[in-house]
Amino acid sequence: MDDKKAGAGVSAEKQKALAAALSQIEKQFGKGSIMRLGDGEIEQDIQVVSTGSLGLDIALGVGGLPRGRVVEIYGPESSGKTTLTLQVVAEMQKLGGTCAFIDAEHALDVQYAGKLGVDVGNLLISQPDTGEQALEITDALVRSGSIDLIVIDSVAALVPKAEIEGEMGDSLPGLQARLMSQGLRKLTGTIKRTNCLVIFINQIRMKIGVMFGSPETTTGGNALKFYASVRLDIRRIGSIKKGDEVVGNETKVKVVKNKVSPPFREAFFDILYGQGISRQGEIIDLGVDAKIVEKAGAWYSYNGEKIGQGKDNAREYLRENPDIADEIENKVRLALGVAPLNTVAGAPAEVEG
């Protein structure tokens, strides 16, 4: 009995000491700097933005890319990396969000971005001279608390100042990796607090002398691999032809890393030249798989009404009737257990200091 009383006394003392420690932490670092998981103040539902591809949203498991996180999209040249990120920008703008594009490659095609649905008039763009400048601009934008999405294109083009000011043949090993490591350490906490999504586009390099395993690696060291909540590997796997003319690419995206849902899922979609990801084609294919769209012979129908003979005609019908396309997409999302399309981007919080 005495042991029980003594145990209860120690427990009460521990609780008192813990309460004092928590109070001290909150006083020093602000309210919300530490909390219990069961308190309900921590956001259980992850806010997402669609990638513009229904199949990829489903493969990500939460209905899109998570906000308040770092995302890396990498792949070979002309695989669709910039197209995919511009589609995400267009989707965020549809929700009323503010987007910024850090064009370190100095290669953004504004006309193409407009064709993909990006409101280029309201897109913030920066073409920094050095890697340090790019990451400082990113940090300032995130800290403002008024930006919903920032794209950095690309990690390979974030050249350290010392390299730009040095001679052409100078050997400066590890400078870019150090720059990325320092920049990401500084950024991650603020990104989470402001609910800003930051997408890094990256390129692939070949490691020399690799006998076993993949010789492929991404630029900028290992920091981004650790800090990224989602890593997407995008590849062109074929061509789409209309007669003899190539009109697009067949694309595969693998979710290589995912901290918000099970990883290693894959998505396949078409990227049409001048149009971007064929959303309507995906809605038809996934709608048929989920038995929401009926297919009889060459005819496609929805709710008992025929929407087109052949996939091209059905795709055209959905392009002309976006409300029906959205309705089918939301039904597919619900059937597969991912979040339906949102309507509001949500106001990010301002960060002090």
Swiss-Prot record:
<dbReference type="InterPro" id="IPR027417">
    <property type="entry name" value="P-loop_NTPase"/>
</dbReference>
<dbReference type="GO" id="GO:0016887">
    <property type="term" value="F:ATP hydrolysis activity"/>
</dbReference>
<dbReference type="InterPro" id="IPR049261">
    <property type="entry name" value="RecA-like_C"/>
</dbReference>
<dbReference type="GO" id="GO:0003684">
    <property type="term" value="F:damaged DNA binding"/>
</dbReference>
<keyword id="KW-0963">Cytoplasm</keyword>
<keyword id="KW-0238">DNA-binding</keyword>
<keyword id="KW-0234">DNA repair</keyword>
<dbReference type="InterPro" id="IPR049428">
    <property type="entry name" value="RecA-like_N"/>
</dbReference>
<dbReference type="Pfam" id="PF00154">
    <property type="entry name" value="RecA"/>
</dbReference>
<dbReference type="InterPro" id="IPR020587">
    <property type="entry name" value="RecA_monomer-monomer_interface"/>
</dbReference>
<dbReference type="GO" id="GO:0009432">
    <property type="term" value="P:SOS response"/>
</dbReference>
<protein>
    <recommendedName>
        <fullName>Protein RecA</fullName>
    </recommendedName>
</protein>
<dbReference type="InterPro" id="IPR013765">
    <property type="entry name" value="DNA_recomb/repair_RecA"/>
</dbReference>
<comment type="function">
    <text>Can catalyze the hydrolysis of ATP in the presence of single-stranded DNA, the ATP-dependent uptake of single-stranded DNA by duplex DNA, and the ATP-dependent hybridization of homologous single-stranded DNAs. It interacts with LexA causing its activation and leading to its autocatalytic cleavage.</text>
</comment>
<keyword id="KW-0233">DNA recombination</keyword>
<dbReference type="GO" id="GO:0003697">
    <property type="term" value="F:single-stranded DNA binding"/>
</dbReference>
<dbReference type="InterPro" id="IPR003593">
    <property type="entry name" value="AAA+_ATPase"/>
</dbReference>
<feature type="binding site">
    <location>
        <begin position="75"/>
        <end position="82"/>
    </location>
    <ligand>
        <name>ATP</name>
    </ligand>
</feature>
<comment type="similarity">
    <text>Belongs to the RecA family.</text>
</comment>
<dbReference type="GO" id="GO:0140664">
    <property type="term" value="F:ATP-dependent DNA damage sensor activity"/>
</dbReference>
<dbReference type="GO" id="GO:0005524">
    <property type="term" value="F:ATP binding"/>
</dbReference>
<keyword id="KW-0742">SOS response</keyword>
<dbReference type="GO" id="GO:0006281">
    <property type="term" value="P:DNA repair"/>
</dbReference>
<dbReference type="InterPro" id="IPR020588">
    <property type="entry name" value="RecA_ATP-bd"/>
</dbReference>
<keyword id="KW-0067">ATP-binding</keyword>
<dbReference type="Pfam" id="PF21096">
    <property type="entry name" value="RecA_C"/>
</dbReference>
<dbReference type="GO" id="GO:0006310">
    <property type="term" value="P:DNA recombination"/>
</dbReference>
<dbReference type="InterPro" id="IPR023400">
    <property type="entry name" value="RecA_C_sf"/>
</dbReference>
<dbReference type="GO" id="GO:0005829">
    <property type="term" value="C:cytosol"/>
</dbReference>
<dbReference type="InterPro" id="IPR020584">
    <property type="entry name" value="DNA_recomb/repair_RecA_CS"/>
</dbReference>
<keyword id="KW-0227">DNA damage</keyword>
<keyword id="KW-0547">Nucleotide-binding</keyword>
